[in-house]
From Swiss-Prot:
A divalent metal cation binds at residues 47, 133, 137. One of its GO terms (molecular function) is metal ion binding. It comes from Bacillus subtilis (strain 168). The gene is yisT. This is Uncharacterized protein YisT. Pfam families: DinB. It comes from the Bacteria. Belongs to the DinB family.
Length: 169
């Protein structure tokens, strides 16, 4: 079984592919309104950053209300792709810091939610949730780009593995 850190590395790789692809499209593409689950591509990407931020804090043991109160700081990036990309890069670095501190990802921890209650999970399962959430929303981005008459970019896990293999020589 591949470990959760590799899946997180895939998540980061795929997000970078999306950001690079969007940077090569007309600038207005990221902000154009579409009829979809989010009003624009930039809104989806900001949502993904917010979710990654929230889950990193859950993994780090931060209390629910403190996470919710601090997640609003990402809102300043609304409508600013450069700021969203910067947040994504900072989050990637923070996740790698987490991985360096938490070496046993199969260890269980307890999370608290005011409505859903208490859940015991492993760090690995929670990281896989982060990756799965990102995969879902990268699919949203691709669908939105197609609505705007632009192609998507392949971000399937197998593309990551092929690229990883090629970079090893």
């Amino acid at each position: 079984m591949t470990d959760a850190k590799q899946f997180y590395d895939y998540h980061s790789w795929a997000n970078k592919k999306i950001f690079t692809h969007i940077e090569n499209l007309p600038e207005e593409t990221a902000y154009q309104e579409v009829k979809s689950v989010f009003p624009s591509v930039s809104d989806v990407l900001l949502h993904m950053c917010r979710a990654d931020y929230i889950w990193l804090n859950v993994l780090s043991g931060v209390a629910y209300q403190e996470i919710i109160d601090s997640a609003g700081k990402l809102q300043s990036a609304q409508g600013n792709m450069a700021a969203i990309k910067q947040h994504a890069a900072e989050l990637e670095s923070q996740y790698h810091d987490f991985f360096s501190r938490q070496t046993d990802l199969e260890q269980t921890f307890t999370m608290q939610h005011p409505k859903l209650g208490t859940l015991e999970s492993t760090y690995a399962d929670t990281i896989l949730h982060v990756v799965n959430h990102g995969t879902y929303h990268r699919g949203n981005v691709t669908a939105m780009l197609r609505q705007l008459d632009h192609s998507g970019v392949p971000t399937d896990y197998m593309y990551y593995l092929y690229e990883k293999r090629e970079s090893k020589g």
